[in-house]
Amino acid sequence: MCVRVPATSANLGPGFDCLGVALDLANEFEFCEADRFRCVVHSTVSPEDARQVATDERNLAWRAFTHLFEHLGKTPPTVALTVMMHVPLGRGLGSSATAIVGGIAAANRWLGSPLSTPEWLLLASRLEGHPDNVVPAALGGCQLSILGETLLTCALDWHPQIALVLAVPDFALATSKARAALPKTVPHTDAVFNAVHLALLVRALATGDARWLAEALQDRLHQPYRTGLIPGWQDVRAAALEAGAWGVVISGAGPSVLALTHLDCAEAVRQAMASTWPNACLYCPGLDPNGCRVEVEAG
């Protein structure tokens, strides 16, 4: 059984912990029945990334796999797990969500799909702690989600002329460190600011309206507290805006940076960001419309 789960970029500015988009870059998790647990990790990103992933029973995909079995009161099988990593670790691209979704989706299919997609997605979101990466990783596209006693998800329209430019720097930022930078409370005016801008962003993404997007991508809940953790943020943001980007946001907890621009400007924005961050990898990723895919080998 092989599970392919896309990378994600969460928040998109004002959508803190509730908004995310699936990208056309994915990790793959292969589960095969075996006589003893084994885990092998390969990375096309870097050998260092592969070394950072646990290959014992602490492996996150394996823990997610067994979590669903235990949730249903079942004994998990012994498997050989192979992980093929294409999503870099610690860059704000939802690598942990790929493991959680991959493990839970595989376990559900292994058992004959006893849980509906909303049911196992709730389990995955609770395991992750927030749904902004997990939901688009599972469902694809751009997703708005709310996690409470239940999980509510809403697929958002994405105008075809909106392009993404992603800058992935050559340094990592631990999500725990990025979370620790956030205050426990924020001014009421900042909360109102984000509520208004998130509402506008939903319409702006659907219409592709340039003025709306330029306004809507602003944030006061998390980015002002995290930009100091990303060396070069101000310069790469300024370069992207100068080249025609509507807005520039931190991808997830960072340190990757995501620019939104018109399709016709994407290459100019990519080159401008690359000239400012010469050691970063620059992409113009498309959206993954499908999300998690499970393939079961016949026989």
Swiss-Prot record:
The keyword Signal does not apply. GO terms for biological process: threonine biosynthetic process. GO terms for cellular component: cytoplasm. It is found in: Cytoplasm. Pathway: Amino-acid biosynthesis; L-threonine biosynthesis; L-threonine from L-aspartate: step 4/5. Pfam families: GHMP_kinases_C, GHMP_kinases_N. Its main location: cytoplasm. It comes from the Bacteria. It catalyses: L-homoserine + ATP = O-phospho-L-homoserine + ADP + H(+). Disulfide bonds: none annotated. One of its GO terms (molecular function) is ATP binding. Catalyzes the ATP-dependent phosphorylation of L-homoserine to L-homoserine phosphate. Belongs to the GHMP kinase family. Homoserine kinase subfamily. This is Homoserine kinase. The lineage of its organism: Bacteria, Bacillati, Cyanobacteriota, Cyanophyceae, Gloeobacterales. The gene is thrB.
